[in-house]
């Protein structure tokens, strides 16, 4: 190759780039911004728990990454060289030369802004046809994926190196967490009590922010494995050559794999996609997480005089919205919900079948050399009683090896359960006499029986290896894999209730009733539900709501009573929104009164997601918990009231400052209400991946929750692309789950210790900040003429809707371009692509400036940043969002707005607030540059960002072509494909969509 493609590297202690031929070249310039000389650099927003977030100067992980950065640079060099070879051989040297020209040119612009050079580069882009632009975009896109994989593998190696040498581990590790608990004086019995209360519950969603296809994820997994193998000690002479060749092969296959979906995924595709992370990483990761926690406990407490071991409960639980979330998605029906549950059921059964088969080959104990427990021997006799109904051959299998014999039967019973699930899925009849496991409790009983028996005759080591791993998997996943939440919008339920009551002649004008009368009537009807003789007479949507509840009951009976998580009511405004669902559930037998006893098999979670709703959450929850009938239903369902908080829509509604503060206060208020009424409140956090949608570092975000509100449990959504970043690789999944668990454990010590209340001065300052921030945000988004026209013209939000990345529409109402109609995901996605990440910071600068006019208040804000985790997380997360913005590039997107006055007004306000926010955050945090306190992330993002510049300018050119009314239809259609690829590429480069 005559030209070499250069790659940026992350986590370097010095600022340098690599020529992929191996030569070190000049330092990267300090980041400059043609619009603002104050900007020193630009970076991209961090993910909700990306690995580079564990960064403090004293952290061993940071030290290791800085010390061994040369290895990372070398690996990125190798991957870049291999990619260059693939581009040259598969696309031609002309493509490679174009990529190199753009790369070099835009890096030079970072060093010395030059309008003439910029126009020259734009002209180069403008002369390229859609067919010529496509491979250029793909080259940069694949580079980002390879560099990200190299970073991920590198960080895994550094953690492995730290663990191998012993001593202090990194922030968020089990060892660090247990050491802190021991130093707090937490006794072994207190530790056991604390762990019993811990529940860490990620909920996987199919929100359309995952722009990466499953086939791409699988290819990247192969690249990760080959890259990791390359670092293993060589066991044969040509070790390096073989794995380098493997990498080349996988990269070439990746080049030949289309990263853009040919069609929009349907819900069935999303259901199958949701299984990928369980099968690919989580089934293997979870036993490792529990094993590491157990060993860390022993290291911390073995010398404690009262320590006699610990019994680890099942602290990890998983949920899902995939196939259950029908809010705004007409493609999710009762049938797809049923299919989602059965698909999850079959997925986990097959995982158990595989692992039981493995145990058959592991637990080969002979009855001549061990004495199984009487209970275990009794279970073998029970198995023999099934002989005529099951398998004539089984008594002949392993007659002298009792555990293999038992496991063989268990495998048969699992396969029978699998066949039963397939029959349900296909709508075929099934013989109930076939003896398959009827639920997870039966299967778990047999596993524990084997373990107890083995321990009884001195085989504890073998009992606590692969067998214990399977027990822990079963306690985590049951027979359902992930508890499926059902979600629907509140007016669907109120309309359904009105329809039912009118059809039955109970109330002809339900909508006119006030809240008091509604609650009274609903309570009476739940106690004595009416009978619907003819559902066919009801409205179509009412019938569908009832069918969904029928499926809930059917699947609870068929698979597990735990198969459903909660029924989430979006846009909940009042207590009757919850009672509507309970009344409809009573019509299908899910709740009601039998004699004097109430029963309830469905928990409801109201979702508060606007600024007004968050402000009114206290009276709504209070009225709900005080409702006599609902109190009895709640007690029948375990006395746990889940309340969901919407980060995305509240931030879109009133801005990041008001949203963050109202969410914080809402948590405190509902927890207090629960304590007053003897009801446990579990908070469900509806967070997105970006800062503007509630994202941020997991461990720090958990610890930043209001003191005393976590109560051992946290449930939160894991949306879109976050899933692939966190759970595509086993090694990363282990890290992410560890960080989450330690965050919950550390933040839940209020269960065993008194917690210190917040300083009231901090609250008064936050009230002022929230008020000023919301006012500034609403002035821009609701009171500035033409703002929404600017949004739709100066961002690619309309074109994002053409990208096949999700089954749900990007707007709540077709053709409605209002702020309330556009979904929070599309709102954030559009601004991010145009490098104007205002949802994550707009209004904060004005708020800080208004408060800091008082010097004493500035001192208080600095103390808040130093001592209050909530405020520190708010400002740190905002820094990550700010450094992702590029006001010079944002200004070029602004030129897409056709109205000059609107363009100048709106962009002027955005740019001014950006400068203001950057200035005041630096003052409050007392830093010279943003992210000064996170040097690894700062360096990593500084290196990645120059490679986004060409992509943004390519996208700008394609947007102009695609939107130009004079462009012929055939040319417009030709521009669409590379335009969609540019959206994918920028999302990958920024590691962020919505």
Annotate each PLM feature.
Residues 48-523, 541, 602, 695, ...:
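Often metal-dependent polyanion-binding catalytic scaffolds in large enzymes
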Residues 3, 15, 19, 27, ...:
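Intrinsic-disorder-associated, low-complexity terminal segments enriched in Asp/Asn/His/Tyr and depleted
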Residues 412, 416, 423, 482-484, ...:
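Active-site cores of enzymes that catalyze phosphoryl transfer or operate on phosphate-rich substrates
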Residues 313-315, 319-321, 329, 471-472, ...:
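Beta-sheet entry/capping signal
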Residues 332-364, 588-775:
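Catalytic or ion-translocation cores adjacent to nucleophile or general acid/base/metal-coordination motifs
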Residues 213-225, 239-258, 436, 467, ...:
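Structured alpha-helical segments in the cores of large, soluble enzyme domains
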Residues 747, 754-994:
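Long, compositionally biased intrinsically disordered regions
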């Amino acid at each position: 190759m005559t030209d070499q493609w250069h790659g940026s590297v992350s986590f370097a202690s010095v600022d340098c780039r690599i020529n992929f031929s191996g030569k070190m070249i000049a330092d990267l310039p300090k980041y400059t911004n043609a619009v603002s000389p104050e900007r020193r650099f630009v970076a991209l927003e961090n993910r909700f728990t990306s690995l580079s977030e564990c960064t403090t100067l004293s952290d061993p992980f940071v030290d290791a990454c800085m010390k061994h950065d040369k290895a990372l640079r070398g690996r990125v060099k190798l991957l870049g060289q291999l990619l260059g070879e693939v581009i040259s051989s598969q696309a031609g040297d002309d493509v490679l030369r174009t990529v190199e020209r753009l790369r070099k040119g835009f890096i030079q612009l970072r060093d010395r802004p030059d309008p003439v050079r910029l126009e020259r580069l734009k002209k180069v882009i403008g002369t390229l046809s859609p067919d010529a632009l496509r491979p250029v975009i793909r080259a940069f896109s694949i580079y980002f994926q390879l560099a990200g994989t190299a970073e991920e593998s590198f960080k895994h190696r550094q953690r492995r190196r730290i663990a191998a040498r012993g001593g202090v581990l990194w922030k968020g590790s089990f060892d660090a967490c247990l050491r802190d608990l021991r130093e707090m004086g937490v006794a072994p019995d207190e530790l056991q009590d604390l762990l019993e209360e811990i529940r860490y519950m990620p909920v996987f969603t199919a929100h359309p922010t995952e722009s990466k296809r499953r086939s791409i994820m699988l290819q990247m997994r192969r690249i990760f494995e080959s890259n990791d193998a390359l670092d293993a000690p060589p066991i044969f002479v040509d070790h390096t050559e073989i794995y380098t060749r493997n990498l080349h092969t996988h990269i070439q296959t990746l080049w030949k794999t289309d990263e853009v979906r040919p069609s929009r995924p349907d819900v069935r595709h999303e259901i199958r996609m949701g299984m990928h992370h369980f099968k690919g990483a989580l089934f293997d990761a979870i036993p490792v997480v529990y094993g590491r926690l157990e060993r860390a406990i022993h290291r911390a407490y073995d010398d404690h005089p009262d320590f006699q071991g610990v019994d680890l409960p099942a602290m990890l639980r998983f949920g899902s919205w995939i196939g259950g979330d029908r809010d705004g998605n007409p493609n999710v029906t009762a049938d797809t919900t049923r299919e989602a549950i059965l698909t999850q059921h079959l997925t986990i059964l097959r995982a158990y079948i595989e692992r039981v088969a493995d145990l058959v080959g592991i637990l080969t104990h002979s009855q001549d050399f061990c004495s199984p427990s009487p209970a275990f021997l009794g279970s073998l006799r029970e198995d023999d009683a099934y002989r005529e109904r099951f398998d004539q051959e089984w008594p002949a299998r392993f007659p002298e090896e009792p555990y293999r014999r038992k496991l063989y039967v268990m495998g048969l019973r699992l396969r029978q359960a699998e066949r039963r699930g397939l029959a349900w899925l296909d709508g075929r009849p099934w013989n109930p006499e076939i003896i398959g496991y009827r639920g997870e409790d039966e299967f778990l009983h047999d596993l524990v029986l084997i373990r107890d028996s083995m321990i009884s005759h001195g085989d504890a080591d073998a009992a606590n290896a692969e067998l214990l791993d399977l027990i822990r998997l079963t306690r985590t996943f049951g027979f359902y894999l992930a508890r499926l939440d059902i979600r629907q919008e509140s007016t669907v339920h109120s309309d359904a209730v009105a329809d039912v009551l009118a059809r039955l002649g109970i109330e002809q004008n339900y909508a006119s009733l006030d809240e008091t009368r509604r609650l009274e009537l609903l309570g009476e009807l739940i106690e004595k539900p009416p009978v619907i003789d003819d559902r066919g007479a009801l409205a179509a949507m009412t019938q569908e709501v009832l069918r969904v509840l029928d499926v809930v009951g059917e699947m609870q009976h068929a698979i597990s009573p735990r198969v459903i998580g909660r029924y989430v009511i979006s846009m909940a405004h009042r207590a009757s929104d919850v009672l509507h669902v309970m009344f409809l559930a009573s019509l299908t037998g899910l709740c009601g009164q039998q004699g004097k006893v109430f029963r309830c098999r469905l928990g409801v979670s109201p979702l508060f997601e606007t600024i007004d709703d968050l402000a009114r959450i206290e009276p709504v929850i209070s009225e709900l918990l005080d409702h006599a009938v609902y109190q009895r239903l709640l007690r029948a369902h375990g006395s746990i009231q889940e309340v969901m908080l919407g980060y995305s829509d509240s931030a879109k509604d009133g801005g990041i400052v008001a949203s963050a503060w109202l969410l914080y206060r809402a948590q405190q208020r509902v927890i207090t209400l629960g304590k007053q009424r003897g009801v446990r409140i579990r908070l469900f956090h509806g967070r997105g991946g970006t800062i503007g949608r509630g994202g941020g570092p997991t461990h720090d975000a958990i610890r930043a929750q209001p003191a005393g509100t976590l109560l051992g449990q946290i449930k939160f959504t894991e949306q879109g692309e976050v899933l692939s970043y966190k759970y595509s690789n086993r090694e990363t999944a282990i890290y992410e789950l560890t960080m989450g668990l330690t965050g919950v454990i550390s933040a839940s010590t209020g269960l065993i210790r008194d917690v210190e209340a917040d300083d009231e001065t901090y609250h008064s300052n936050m009230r002022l900040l929230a008020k000023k921030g919301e006012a500034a945000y609403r002035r821009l988004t609701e009171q500035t003429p033409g703002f929404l026209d600017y949004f739709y013209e100066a961002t690619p939000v309309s074109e994002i809707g053409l990208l096949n990345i999700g089954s749900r529409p990007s707007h709540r109402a077709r053709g409605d371009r209002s702020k309330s109609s556009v979904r929070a995901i599309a709102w954030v996605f559009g601004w991010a692509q145009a490098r104007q990440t205002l949802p994550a910071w707009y209004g904060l600068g004005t708020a800080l400036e208004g408060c800091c006019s008082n010097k004493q208040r500035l001192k208080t804000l600095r103390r808040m940043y130093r001592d209050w985790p909530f405020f520190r997380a708010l400002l740190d997360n905002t820094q990550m969002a700010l450094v992702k913005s590029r006001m010079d590039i944002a200004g070029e997107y602004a030129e897409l707005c056709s109205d000059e006055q609107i363009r100048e007004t709106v962009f002027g306000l955005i740019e001014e607030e950006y400068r203001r926010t950057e200035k005041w955050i630096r003052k409050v945090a007392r830093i010279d540059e943003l992210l000064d306190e996170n040097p690894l992330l700062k360096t990593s993002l500084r290196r990645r960002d120059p490679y986004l510049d060409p992509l943004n300018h390519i996208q700008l050119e394609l947007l102009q072509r695609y939107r130009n009314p004079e462009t012929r239809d055939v040319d417009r259609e030709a521009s669409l494909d590379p335009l969609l690829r540019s959206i994918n590429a920028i999302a990958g480069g920024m590691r962020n969509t919505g």
